Amino acid sequence: MSLRLAAQQVEVSRERAGSAASEPAIASPIQGVKAYQLRDSFNEIHHGHRHEAIDIMAPTGTPVRAVVDGTIQKLFLSKAGGNTIYEFDDEGEYCYYYAHLERYADGLHEGTRVSRGEVIGYVGSTGDASPAAPHLHFAIYLLGPQRHWWRGTAIDPYPVLERSLIASRSSSVPIYLILEMLHAAG
């Protein structure tokens, strides 16, 4: 298989990855994160319960960005999540949860309209996060008809974020994946 054919297959994979119609299209909450750097931890047991989120490792103080255009529904200090943000999308269909923040962006308050990619906070290790492992705990919830910030159906953010990163071409394909495709094709 030629390198050109392998590149075309990668392109087709990217197009397919971006076509999941039932999931929200989101931006990365941490600029520069690549799809291959993510690890699915949704079903892992953390502190006695299912994690239902993804942890994105980043240095303390790294900007956290809104993944969609929306409204800050709730800023909340919790024992487990520390400084948290609950963002609703414009349709009120999904809630995006950002936790363990070092701090919020200046001027951010409940009811603030935010744009996709806008800085809303900074990575930290507040709540029950280890100071040795600062990260963003990121979750997605499908809201019910009541649209409560504290209640929704958890959606695994890993495949949603991975597909969005690949589809947006913000993620480079590691050379080892191309080589594996070439090897598999014989």
Give the residues covered by each predicted segment.
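Surface-exposed, glycine-biased beta-strand/turn segments
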Residues: 2-83, 116, 125, 154-186
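Generic beta-structure capping elements
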Residues: 41, 59, 90, 101, ...
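Solvent-exposed loop/turn segments at secondary-structure junctions
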Residues: 43-45, 63, 77-80, 91-94, ...
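Short linear sequence elements within intrinsically disordered, low-complexity coil regions
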Residues: 47, 102-103, 109, 146, ...
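Zn2+-dependent peptidoglycan hydrolase active-site motif and core
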Residues: 67-110, 133-139
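Conserved, short, structured surface segments that act as functional micro-motifs
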Residues: 86, 94, 112-172
